[in-house]
Amino acid sequence: RQRQMCIRDRGIKDNVEEVKENLQAGPSLTAGAEPREEGSMVLRTEDLVKKYGKRTVVSHVSIDVKQGEIVGLLGPNGAGKTTSFYMTVGLITPNEGRIFLNDLDITKYPVYKRAQTGIGYLAQEASVFRQMSVEDNIASVLEMTDKPLEYQKDKLESLIAEFRLQKVRKNKGNQLSGGERRRTEIARCLAIDPKFIMLDEPFAGVDPIAVEDIQQIVWKLKDRNIGILITDHNVQETLSITDRAYLLFEGKILFQGTPEELAENKIVREKYLSNSFVLRRKDFMK
């Protein structure tokens, strides 16, 4: 089902019932989907608030991501970035505020319905089917799209070639390296032709030598006019490929701007990056 594709239950302690409700998948990744508007789309949040009892963990957070750009969502532990990210994904319901895809209010949409509107989600934890081959992992998503069989076959071969999975296409999910697994997960997510992809800790569990490979893949998604929202504790790896970034601190947005602007801001360096931080952009971006 859809929840097994680009969706994973993060098992958030305070939101078990919300997650269960949000992961109630419908019959198809395309059935009942809202029509996508032509041109550049914008995914945005307006004044999101999340409270647990008397404690406010996110206070009036507004962010936006346009198609064809990579946006980082950063912050120290306890800053509210993960909660803000999960509200945008649809795993957590905000107490206040709204989430829009262009002018469509998707605040109450469960994750599977957001996928139908063109929002893909790649969880931090491994989401490949461990006992299925790489090609079957991808094909299982294509089968849910209601596309013609010939299209599904062509799309499968295209994704396997693009993500250099030819040598491991028959390997089961539990036989893949961290980098191979990530490439398979991204390829599978692209099977539904998303307009946006939410990346949760994409560099976690990946060997250092494979990190740049994943960065290049994410960067090239811009060529598909896909908007990317990344949240990751690996600040250098994230800022090195983002167009813009938001820094959350104590539940609020402390700063937003380009990676260069963040790296040069005195308050950001004092509270988060440290004075020794040096931004290193990737050569493949030039």
Q: What is the meaning of each model-derived region?
A:
Residues 104, 150-168, 216-219:
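Conserved ABC ATPase "signature" region
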Residues 2-7:
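Short, small-residue-biased leader/transition segments that mark boundaries at the very start
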Residues 197-201:
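Catalytic Walker B motif of ABC-type/P-loop ATPase nucleotide-binding domains
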Residues 193:
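Conserved catalytic motifs of ABC-family nucleotide-binding domains
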Residues 172-176, 180:
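Conserved ABC ATPase signature
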Residues 74-76:
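The feature captures the beta-strand-to-loop junction immediately N-terminal to the Walker
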